[in-house]
Amino acid sequence: MSLGIRYLALLPLFVITACQQPVNYNPPATQVAQVQPAIVNNSWIEISRSALDFNVKKVQSLLGKQSSLCAVLKGDAYGHDLSLVAPIMIENNVKCIGVTNNQELKEVRDLGFKGRLMRVRNATEQEMAQATNYNVEELIGDLDMAKRLDAIAKQQNKVIPIHLALNSGGMSRNGLEVDNKSGLEKAKQISQLANLKVVGIMSHYPEEDANKVREDLARFKQQSQQVLEVMGLERNNVTLHMANTFATITVPESWLDMVRVGGIFYGDTIASTDYKRVMTFKSNIASINYYPKGNTVGYDRTYTLKRDSVLANIPVGYADGYRRVFSNAGHALIAGQRVPVLGKTSMNTVIVDITSLNNIKPGDEVVFFGKQGNSEITAEEIEDISGALFTEMSILWGATNQRVLVD
């Protein structure tokens, strides 16, 4: 009787369990993820892997074992895309990378760089507090800033490596003025901050003149020696560095312990023609139209056709970094031939005259900077028309166009 009662007590559980069992259960079909097609862009920047790799190796060969290399990749690698450039530096065993903002610090570390990571400008207190996560060597040029960084380091129980910037080059930007007792005393106090470690002393050249470089170098050598003495630091324990791209190529004695170079990696230097350009700015023809002599072109009718003309519509404008200064002044390359920009550059459109060309069709490649066939739009041409440094333009183009690694 008791056994029957026990089974009756379990009956509700059997019923519930049975009700929970699937009937004619069919497992869901495996969902196959659809591959999304790549977005087709109206314009893009090609970054030549082979040219970049060539330039890096050439700099390394130039320096040999006489000095170390810090690759400056600030400004999103001068507009060339840090995420594309940094891995090539890592592949070439570059030991030091210089950047500016915390996003760049994070990106370089996330890409797997394990070497020295240096900030090459003064940082805000908020930046410095966060940057301790990335094991960065901060640039310090005044006592107050050093004290604030020391407090951050103490709060986080860390010792932060720093590079003391001197104003030896006369930039009057980041550096500590040490040509007087007050400046030397500040340098001494910086060295005594318990949570900072001086690992480098640096300065910067404000102009590209070999004789001026030598003058500034002599001043830096003298001042850095004085600073080392008041700080009580061993010379072999501190990296001295001042050379930029121009100084590195033209004044070898400026190399010291390390050089900081950036533009040279992209072929952007007046000091040598031995380095290759890395960037090409491209688009395609959207449409072709025929217009009679006397028609005007673009906003404000700034150009009047002098003949019956064939005009190509290129989907690039100042929204893509092709500024209005190129209106009626710039050129593009189509089929290896130079063609003039007519009228004012619109936000999203440029018109070029292809009347003299044959067999041109929509979809054909257009180059606004770089080489196509035997023709080239040079950096000097871009600078002459725009009134801007080419670096300004490359950073602008990089910020407004997709960058793709080629060859």
Curated annotation (Swiss-Prot):
A lipid is attached at C19 (N-palmitoyl cysteine). Optimum pH is 8.0-9.0. Gene3D superfamilies: Alanine racemase, Lyase, Ornithine Decarboxylase, Chain A, domain 1. The active site is at K74 (proton acceptor), Y299 (proton acceptor). Forms a head-to-tail homodimer in the structure. Amino-acid racemase that catalyzes the interconversion of L-lysine and D-lysine. To a lesser extent, is also able to interconvert arginine enantiomers. Cannot use methionine, asparagine, alanine, leucine, glutamine, phenylalanine and histidine as substrates. This is Lysine racemase.
